[in-house]
Amino acid sequence: DLFSRKVVGWSMSHRMTANLVNQALLSALGSRAPERGLIWHTDRGSQYASDSHRQLLKENGLVQSMSRKGNCWDNAVAESFFKTLKTGLIYHKQYKTREEAQDDIFDYIEVFYNKSRLHSSNDYRSPIDYEEMRFVA
């Protein structure tokens, strides 16, 4: 979520496919139930341009936005998250199984990143704290 930097939908697989990104989108839709017209921004990967992904966006009233060709800055928030995930967790461990890695990534996102990691764009609050502060006030 660009507003709070909260990871609202995600999925894991050994391959980057349209099904994987569709599962992540369904996860996000389940956690947020956004209004029609919400902008769904991604890079230009073929999985995001797939017919199944475009159809899922259309069925849920979302507007697709894709980065300009060769411009990583258009997707800087997502790129920054993945850099943080890799440098803060993945590069420091050796996992024996895919399941062990998935469990660790789940904890990183749901326990640490969304609940505890501070963001300068959130007045140095975690995504969840920032949302609570902004929506309760």
Regions found by a protein language model. Name each.
Residues 1-137:
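Charged DNA-binding/catalytic regions of mobile-element recombinases
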